[in-house]
Amino acid sequence: MAIIINIDVMLAKRKMSVTELSERVGITMANLSILKNGKAKAIRLSTLEAICKALECQPGDILEYRSDEDTGFVKKKYEGSTEK
């Protein structure tokens, strides 16, 4: 399972730069990059709220769920490991 954060689409719609979003939300460019690139393991609700406020959007506008099949992960039933 993967939750994807699609910030780029909303940035383009709002004609806002990553730098401007970073300043408005109060997070570093590095952390914003982690969110954008799908490397984040979690996001605080307060951060999500700040992003939505800055982009004038709803959480559903930037969050997307993808199943394991969509992301290419296969779980081994008996071994408990994952392969890609």
Curated annotation (Swiss-Prot):
Domain of life of the organism encoding this protein: Bacteria
Keyword Mitochondrion annotated: no
Record-linked PROSITE patterns: HTH_CROC1
A molecular function GO annotation: DNA binding
InterPro entries (alphabetical): Cro/C1-type_HTH (IPR001387), Lambda_DNA-bd_dom_sf (IPR010982)
Keyword Secreted in record: no
Residue stretches making up the HTH cro/C1-type domain: 7-62
DNA-binding region: 18-37
CDD domains with a match to the protein in the record: HTH_XRE
Coiled-coil annotated residue ranges, if any: none
Pfam families linked: HTH_26
Keywords in alphabetical order: DNA-binding, Transcription, Transcription regulation
UniProt-recorded name of the protein: Uncharacterized HTH-type transcriptional regulator YozG
Organism (species): Bacillus subtilis (strain 168)
